[in-house]
């Protein structure tokens, strides 16, 4: 373990109606692919992302047209909106004025002190945080001159430089990212950052690649970082539909037991014993439970040999055999069902468990 269990020892930072850091769960983020000034397209994509489980969304802000679109976008969405700014402080001011819940900007890159002061003053007045985005591919010349090439120490030094600029202006609502496309470099940078400061860390492996390769690369890098107890919010960067980024991020958090509001599927690898159409059933169930916001573990198993034992780990499951299925709940056989109704019966049982969970949550809230 690292010296800091970062998820529980970071400074809590408010982003819209969420708190990132402190004792809060890791938050899933994504970024739109639309032109931000196209409000209709941007809002439509954000709503798709939210439906997939995205909790915070970022939009690019390359020009004043994009900045001026922020109020119209904000009115139509319900998750916090982060605005990505590079170099032009006037865009940051416009985005903040328009209702951005957070801005991503490196204070050392926007020029003279009065520009930084103006952005910090506006952020303070609105009570919104600033994310410092350190990227191995765009480190300052002085850092590269000192270290020769992108290193974890250089990335941390860059982060501390930007942090100091904000702290000197008495600004502390800061979130930091330490992104690199090299997995080992990213892991080292985040580990060193977690020891260097207590601001929340936004995790990401940048330029990770296509849906398949990027998923593997992100899972390797982000998984190693999360396993050290580091990270408060995460974005999986893929050259794909951003909805896929959210799916991968949620699945990754579920793998480490870090998503209390998500259902999980267990399904066995195929073998010669299987007597049902396991692959299509597993895919259908994965899609079905993806929108369930309850910590339910669902098993889809292909035979009665390993099924009963493996189903014990699940809240609900089915083991197929010779044209029928054994429906399990908490490892106990509930009943036999014909293969043709197996999936629908399983869905009904999942819905019952979800309803029980939500009813229990309401009781706890009243208590």
UniProtKB/Swiss-Prot annotation:
An annotated GO BP: terpenoid biosynthetic process
Function statement: Converts 2C-methyl-D-erythritol 2,4-cyclodiphosphate (ME-2,4cPP) into 1-hydroxy-2-methyl-2-(E)-butenyl 4-diphosphate.
Origin species: Halalkalibacterium halodurans (strain ATCC BAA-125 / DSM 18197 / FERM 7344 / JCM 9153 / C-125) (Bacillus halodurans)
Protein name according to UniProt: 4-hydroxy-3-methylbut-2-en-1-yl diphosphate synthase (flavodoxin)
Gene3D superfamilies the UniProt entry points to: Dihydropteroate synthase-like (3.20.20.20), Sulfite Reductase Hemoprotein, domain 1 (3.30.413.10)
Gene: ispG
Cofactor: [4Fe-4S] cluster
NCBIfam families given in the database record: ispG_gcpE, PRK00366.1
Pfam families in alphabetical order: GcpE
Keywords: 4Fe-4S, Iron, Iron-sulfur, Isoprene biosynthesis, Metal-binding, Oxidoreductase
EC number(s) from the headed UniProt entry: 1.17.7.3
UniProt pathway: Isoprenoid biosynthesis; isopentenyl diphosphate biosynthesis via DXP pathway; isopentenyl diphosphate from 1-deoxy-D-xylulose 5-phosphate: step 5/6
Matches recorded under InterPro entries: Dihydropteroate_synth-like_sf, IspG_bac, IspG_bac-typ, NO2/SO3_Rdtase_4Fe4S_sf
């Amino acid at each position: 373990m690292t010296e800091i269990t970062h998820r529980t020892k970071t400074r809590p930072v408010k982003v819209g109606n969420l708190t990132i850091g402190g004792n809060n769960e890791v938050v899933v983020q994504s970024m739109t692919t639309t032109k931000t000034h196209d409000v209709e397209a941007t809002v439509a994509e954000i709503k798709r992302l939210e439906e997939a489980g995205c909790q915070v969304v970022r939009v690019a802000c390359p020009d004043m047209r994009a900045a001026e679109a922020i109020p119209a976008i904000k009115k139509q969405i319900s998750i916090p909106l982060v605005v990505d700014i590079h170099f032009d402080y006037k865009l940051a001011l416009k985005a903040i004025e328009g209702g951005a819940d957070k801005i991503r900007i490196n204070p050392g890159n926007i020029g003279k002190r009065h520009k930084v002061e103006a952005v910090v003053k506006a952020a303070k007045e609105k009570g919104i945080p600033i994310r410092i985005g350190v990227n191995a591919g765009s480190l300052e010349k002085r850092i590269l001159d000192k270290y020769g090439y992108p290193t974890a120490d250089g990335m941390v030094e860059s982060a501390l430089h930007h942090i100091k600029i904000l702290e000197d202006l008495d600004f502390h609502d800061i979130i930091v990212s330490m992104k690199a496309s090299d997995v080992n470099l990213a892991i080292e940078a985040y580990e060193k950052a977690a020891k260097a400061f207590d601001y929340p860390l936004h995790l990401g492996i940048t330029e990770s690649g296509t849906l398949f390769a990027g998923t593997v690369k992100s899972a390797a890098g982000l998984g190693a970082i999360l396993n050290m107890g580091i990270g408060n919010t995460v974005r999986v960067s893929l050259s794909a539909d951003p909805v896929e980024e959210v799916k991968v991020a949620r699945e990754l958090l579920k793998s480490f037991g870090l998503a209390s509001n998500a259902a999980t599927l267990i399904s066995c690898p195929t073998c010669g014993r299987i007597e049902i159409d396991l692959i299509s059933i597993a895919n259908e169930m994965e899609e079905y439970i993806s929108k369930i916001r309850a910590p339910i573990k669902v098993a889809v198993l292909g035979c009665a040999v390993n099924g009963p034992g493996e189903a014990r780990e699940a809240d609900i499951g089915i083991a197929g055999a010779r044209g029928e299925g054994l429906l399990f709940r908490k490892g106990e056989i509930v009943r036999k069902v014909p293969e043709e109704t197996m999936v629908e019966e399983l869905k009904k049982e999942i819905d019952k468990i979800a309803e029980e969970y939500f009813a229990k949550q309401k009781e706890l809230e009243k208590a």
